[in-house]
């Protein structure tokens, strides 16, 4: 997205025409099985953000590697250092499915209807400005569940039972309307997908996240 973090459209899912061009140039078509590889404990869950966005664009056969890049290396799978050269292809996206997307406008309008979950680090939640946010803090009343709490010490997802208990112990129920956010909608996309996997169906990733909210909304510390 053009501009900088915190701008009105920065961090949002691209419009269908833009996304068609982006994915088409990479040869990522809907008839392929797509495997996404990222980092878990050492990253922000970029693979989940891509999965979340591809699903919204109508891609159905998309998977992530549990444990990420480290798990693949530890398994002994063959890797290479040379960059791949994708072959461009035609991609058609009729519309974006916004059923698991939260917008700034909706959150401002109906804030009290949602339970808000901040998945950033302790430092960020408590007010540290680490990534050029307009101000520090967290959304008013936000429940704090760290993104890294989704994983065991080796970087693999915890069991559904462990995760569900963690969410419920934090004050969430499967009937709640839940909004996840982080700095730029990446870690929160991972958390939204995991919550959905655990049966929390009414979950929404706030893709603009704190970068935008710090510009337009109130925060607590």
Task: Write out the residue ranges for each language-model feature.
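Active-site neighborhoods of enzymes that stabilize oxyanions during catalysis
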Residues: 70-136, 140, 218-221
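Loop/turn elements at helix/coil->beta-strand transitions in domains of secreted/extracellular proteins
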Residues: 30-33, 60, 112-115, 140, ...
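C-terminal soluble interaction/assembly domains
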Residues: 165, 175-221
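Extracellular/periplasmic catalytic domains that process cell-envelope and extracellular macromolecules
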Residues: 27-30, 47, 109-111, 135-138, ...
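Helix-loop module immediately N-terminal to the HCX5R catalytic loop
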Residues: 3-34, 147-178, 220
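Solvent-exposed loop/turn segments at secondary-structure junctions
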Residues: 1-2, 40-44, 69-71, 121-125, ...
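Thiolate-centered catalytic microenvironments shared by cysteine-dependent enzyme domains
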Residues: 10-101, 105-106, 187-203, 208-209
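Terminal peptide-recognition signature
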Residues: 54, 118, 142, 195, ...
């Amino acid at each position: 997205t053009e501009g900088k973090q915190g701008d009105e459209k920065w961090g949002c899912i691209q419009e269908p025409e833009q996304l068609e061009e982006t994915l088409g140039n990479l040869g990522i078509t809907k008839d392929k099985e797509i495997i996404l590889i990222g980092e878990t404990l050492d990253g922000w869950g970029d693979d989940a953000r891509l999965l979340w966005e591809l699903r919204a664009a109508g891609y159905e056969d998309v998977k992530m590697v549990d444990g990420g890049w480290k798990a693949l290396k530890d398994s002994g799978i063959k890797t290479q250092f040379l960059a791949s050269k994708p072959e461009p292809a035609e991609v058609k996206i009729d519309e974006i499915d916004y059923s698991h997307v939260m917008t700034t406008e909706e959150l401002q309008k109906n804030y009290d209807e949602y339970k808000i979950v901040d998945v950033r680090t302790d430092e960020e939640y408590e007010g540290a400005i680490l990534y050029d946010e307009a101000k520090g803090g967290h959304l008013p009343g936000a429940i704090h569940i760290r993104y890294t709490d989704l994983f065991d010490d080796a970087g693999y997802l915890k069991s559904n039972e462990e995760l569900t208990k963690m969410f419920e112990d934090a004050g969430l129920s499967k009937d709640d309307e839940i909004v996840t956010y982080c700095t730029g909608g990446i870690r929160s996309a991972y958390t939204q997908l995991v919550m959905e996997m655990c049966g929390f169906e009414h979950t929404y990733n706030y893709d603009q996240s704190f970068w935008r909210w710090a510009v337009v909304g109130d925060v607590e510390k």
